[in-house]
Each structure stands twice: as C-alpha cells, then as structure tokens.
Amino acid sequence: MWRLVAESAAGGTYHFLTGTDYVVGRKNCAILIPEDQSISRCHATLSVSHPSANLGQTNAASVLSIKDSSKYGTTVNGDKMNPAVPRNLKSGDKVTFGVFNSKYRVEYEPLVVCSSCLDNSEKNSLNQNLIHLGGHVLNNWTEKSTHLVMTSIKVTIKTICALICCKPIIKPDYFCELLHAIQEKRPLPDYRSFIPSVDEPSLTPESLDLSENVKRKSIFKDKVFLFLNAKQYKKLSPAVLFGGGKTDLLMGELKDASVLDNPATCVIDVAMTESQLSESQSTQPWITSTLDLLQSKGLRTIPEAEIGLAVINVSTEIYCNPRRRAASGTEAGTSKKMNVLSSTLCQGIAVDETILPAPTLDITAYAANTEPQDQTGTSWMNISGVREVKETPGNSSSHSRSKGCLQKDPKSGSSSNDLRQTLFREDETDTRKNTPSLLPTKSSARDVTKTSQKLQPTKKIDSYFQSLAKKRDRAEDEKEASSSKLPRVETLSSQTLEEKFPPVTQTLEEENFDSDLDMELAMSCDQILNDSMGSKAAMPEDSTVKKRKVPDDHVVEESDVDSDEGIRANAEQNDTKSDINVTKRRKVDSEIEGTKEPTIKPREIGTKAQVKTNSPEMAPAIRKEIEVKKELDIKKEPKSQWEESKFVPDLQGETDALPSRLLLTEFKSLVVSRPVRNNNATSNSSNGKCHNFKKFKKVAYPGAGSFPNIIGGSDLIAHDRKKNAELEQWLRQEVEEQTQQVREESLAEDLFRYNPKPSKRRR
C-alpha cells in the first residue's frame, strides 16, 4: 500500500488506491498545496497499478507512477522530470513540487494477508478489497505475511505462526473499513478493534494471549525437533523455524543415539496422527526402535499439540519438554486439550477427534454371517426389500455387498435358482393347498414357478440374483391377463371358438365350467409341448391328453388361416392396426375374466363334444362350420357407412355373430380444396332479373388512351458510380493546362501594358 508523506508539519499523509488518478495542484485537486505560488492548477498526476493476476504473487508489488504537467517542473531526488513522460517511484524517493519547499516522501507498506477458515463469499470480498489496496492474499503463512484473517480464532498452524511472528489476527471486515476510510479521507481504523473471538472448547479467552510478545520469536531457541513423518515435518517445521528452533526428519535408524540424551531434543509423536499415516509407515521397525530407545532413557515423545500450547503460554517448561510430565491433577484436562489442539492443527478446524465416530461401514452386508441360522428367512426378506429400491444410486454399493454375502451363506445353496426356490418354498406349499388340481398331471419346476409368480412378484428377486433382459411391465388393468397367459396353441384355439360362438347369456354353473375348461386346455397344451420335445413317459392320466392332441393341432392351423383371411379383409377396408388390437384385447379379457352372459347352445354342444367326448369326428365339422361362418362374415361386412346402415335391418338375425364394440376409424384429408363451380349456375345467374349482375362501368382515367412513354435517347446512357482514375487524371490535367494558359496570358498582358506613373521631382 503506497502513501505520500509530507516532510513539513503543515502537510499531511495521502494513501493511494489502485485504479485512481490523484492530481497534485493548487486548487480543486485530490492533493492540495495552496500556499505555494509555483504550483500549477494541475501540477502532477500520481497513480497506482496492480493487476489482479499479481494478487497471489508477493514478488510482483504494485507500482506507483508520477507524470509532470506543470510550468515550473517537478523533481525526484533532485532530478527534474521530463514533462509528459511518466516515471515510476520507489519507496523512500523524495519528490519536490515547484521551486519552493513543497517536499514529500514516498513510502510503501507491504500488505500480505493469509486467510484461514473463510468461506467462499468472505474470500471473494477479501480479494476485491486487497486488489484496491494493492495487497496480496496467500493461502499459507510465509515470512512476508503481515496479517492473518479469521472470522473466529482457532488454534491452527497459521495461528501459531502468526503469534510467533507477532502479526495481528483480524477479521476480514477490517480491510473493508480501511478501504472506505481511504476513499473518504478519514483516519485509518485501528486493527485492535477487529480482533475475532476465540472459538476453542479447551481454551478460554483469558488464557489465550493474542498480543504481540517478542519472546515468542525465540520460544524454540536452541531446541531440535525430530520428526518421524514427512507430512508432519512439512506442516510443523515452519512454526519451529519461526520460533528460532531447528528441525530434522528421520528417515531411518538413528546413527547417533546420544542425540536423544540432549534435553533440548524433542521427538514428535506419531500416535496422535495415525489417521494421517499409512499403515505400512506406522509399523516400520526403525520407528518402533526409536520410540523404545526413547522410553528406555526415561524420556517421552512430544505431541504436536504441545507446540501450539508452548507458543500460547510462552513457555517450554511444561510443554515441549521431554523430561517433564503433566501433573496428575491436570492430566485429564491436559489430554483433552491436546486432543482438541492436535485435531485442529491437523485439519485446520476445531474438532475433537475423540468424539468423532469410527468410519461408518455398511454393517448390513455382514448380517447373514452374524445372525443365527433360525433367522435366515428374516434376512432374506430384508434382501427382497433392498431389491425394491435397486434404482436408487446411493444403494448400489449395499446391493453388491448383500449380494456377495448371500451367495457365501452356507444355507443358500450353490446356485441362484436354488435360493429363489428356497425363498418362496412356504408360499408355494400354501398355493398348492389352496388351489385345487384340475387335472392330475406331473408337477414340474416350471409349473411351481408359474404358481409362485401368480401370487407374489418374484420378478424383482429374479432380476436381483441374475441379470436377465426383462420385458416392460404391463398396465395394472392387464395384470391378470399377463399372469395367466397361455401358450399360443391354447390362445388361438380359444380365439377360434369365440369367433364362432360369441357370448350372449350364461348361468353360474356354465361360467365355472368355462373357467375349468380354460385351465384344462392350458395344462393339456403344456403336456403336448413336452411330448413333442421327446418326453414319452406315459402315465394313466396321459390318455385324455393325447386324445386332445389331434383336434388342437387342427384348430391351430385353421385359426392361422382364418386370422390371415381376416387380416386381408381388414386390409381391403383400410382398417388400421388399432382395430385388430382392440379386438384382441376384448378376446383376452373375455378369456380371463369369464363371460358374464351365458353362451348359446351351439357353443355348448361344440365345446362339450370337443373336450369331454374327445371324438375325432367333431373336429372336421367344427372346422367346416368355422370356415363357412368366416366367409359369411367377410362377405357381409359393410364397406361404407351408408351400406352398413342399409344392411342393419336385413341382417338383424346375424348381428350376434359379428364382433361388437368396435372402433370406427375414418381417414380424411387435411388439405382444403376449393369446390368446383357449377357452370350451369353461373350461366343462369347472368340471365333474367338477377341481382348479382354487374351494372357499373370502368371510367377511363386521363392518359389511359395515350401512347406509352417510350424511354430512349439520353435516358439509355449507362450510369457508372465507380470513379475512373484515367478520366479524372485527364480532367485534372485539362484544368491545370487551362489555368496555366490563363496565367501566361495575364502575364503577357502585364508585360506589354505600359502605363508608368509620372514622378514629380522636388525642386
């Protein structure tokens, strides 16, 4: 921070800010010298430059320059300045304005601030203020530091260094107030009124002396501090060196054990900073041997917190003394104080490490190994609960841990499939008890899995133990259909039966019979697929299934043909895929929920004949009837809206066989076209007494009957805006020649014109 101090008592002191021009003059100036007549109105200009890039570089100080603009001149150290040429000033230069005794001295006070425990907003405000003041901001304490800025005093390594160097510890508001005082030309504020409060749980404001004490500069004189860790050495060695001590880093065995006999030798303990040390380094043998040797001599290691306590108390009799132990009465309080200060020195904030819990671990990952065996089911249920929130990013680690833990559980089995079966074994047994068996077929693992999936959502468990490509979940209104979905053979056959016999009315007994029939068809289709794959083991109950195999296969083939014909018919009518999807959904819903209306007797007869009698003669009859019915449906299907309205009264008896509740789709063009005019209407409008006949007459305006204006002659000369250099030069030469000719003619006339004035002689 630059300032200009007057050597005479009448003058004052002027402080300079960056980015501002200070004018020295006799009137209406920032620096007034009114009593000197040799001072001009604007005698000289002073300015300070300090780029923001030099804020963290203490070697790049701000620059004060002066520019003279006076009549009688300005001298710097006796040398007269060249007007209008600026000159940089140095600290200690003497500047004289004018020819009389207006002498001033230039002084520079470095302003290097070290910040500690400040948030981002406070740091930004501090940086802006110091840029205007021409100072610097550092993150670490150095020899050039002049102030330590803290909102509340905590015993950190920066605080210890500031106390040793006898530098003030102030709030960041001090520099804001200093900036305003310079701008308003008020007296500078006192830093003692900006000392922050003490924020240490183990220290009281009375016990912490923050005043400047010169004894702290030599607090560690003639002492040698031995560090066993490089990180401690790098952090604490500046404080020891500022206090007049010596430091050394031990990298191996002591070559001279007699060094420890010196009472001024202090070995810094590594036990208080185990969190900072790696496990391999803390167990090195030479560290252990050094500590054992020190203990054998009756000496103790020095905790790093005692360095700060020795500086605060300005004494090394109790602290940093390897031969002196703490008194028994104050041992508990001293240990607590050391814990707080050591944690503060390590981290830069006041935190008691004894209160902090150990690093948190996911203990639930080891629950399967620690709980008794009778609680295995409970732990599995917890895993299923974790699986429900598997999309949460924060629980990904716990999922992986619990997964690995469950696979190592001896009760879980060797594969994930066995574990899934064990998880829901009780539910499967309950399902077998509650669900009556419709057909006595052989139970398989797939049937058990289907039954368990129907009652409980095991898809989450499946995807948890093995990564499979899952299909998208259907809507809630189709959950029943998805859970009881049948193979393609049964679905197509049921669709064919429904197309032939639509539901009309039905009693309660027939509804139960249809549901039993659907279950029988599902189980029989599964058995047919198993037999086709090669499982030819026969049972007493397989006879009924094998009898159904022939008509079912025929039904599949005919249903495929019928569906193809239906698609062609729909394509001719320009129906969309949405119509087919609506029809299929209605059919699936009718299969699952059961028709609430009884069916007509042809369906009853055909179904019973196909399922219960199982006679092969009924299959061709049903197939022929289906084909005839399908052809009738295709032929009699309406092709337009007008035809449909015409056929409704004629085909009233056959409307029951047609699908109901369909969606009618119409395709219309979005392009608006003009209607074609009727020529007959136009011709008729011109005849007779039509009110739309034009009766007005075009009036000729003046000049309408004259000839058009023909452009020609001079109008066709091309207009070029570009300058022609040759033409301009030729014109210029012509003008010069004409002027030269006129000048010559006038000169010739003057030569040949003789009109002398008569001169009168005096007699």
Swiss-Prot record:
CDD domains assigned: BRCT_nibrin, FHA_NBN
BRCT domain location: 102-179, 215-324
Keywords recorded for this protein, A-Z: Cell cycle, Chromosome, DNA damage, DNA repair, Meiosis, Nucleus, Telomere
Major subcellular site: nucleus
GO biological process: DNA double-strand break processing; DNA strand resection involved in replication fork processing; double-strand break repair; double-strand break repair via homologous recombination; isotype switching; meiotic cell cycle; metaphase chromosome alignment; mitotic G2 DNA damage checkpoint signaling
GO CC annotations on file: chromosome, telomeric region; Mre11 complex; nuclear inclusion body; PML body; site of double-strand break
Extent of motif FxF/Y motif: 748-757
Location of this chain's protein in the cell: Nucleus; Chromosome; Nucleus, PML body; Chromosome, Telomere
Residue window of motif Nuclear localization signal: 469-474
Keyword DNA repair belongs to the record: yes
InterPro entries named in the record: BRCT_dom, BRCT_dom_sf, FHA_dom, Nibrin-rel, Nibrin_BRCT2, Nibrin_BRCT2_sf, Nibrin_C, Nibrin_met
PANTHER family cross-referenced by the UniProt entry: NIBRIN, NIBRIN-RELATED
Protein name per the record: Nibrin
Biological classification of the source: Eukaryota, Metazoa, Chordata, Craniata, Vertebrata
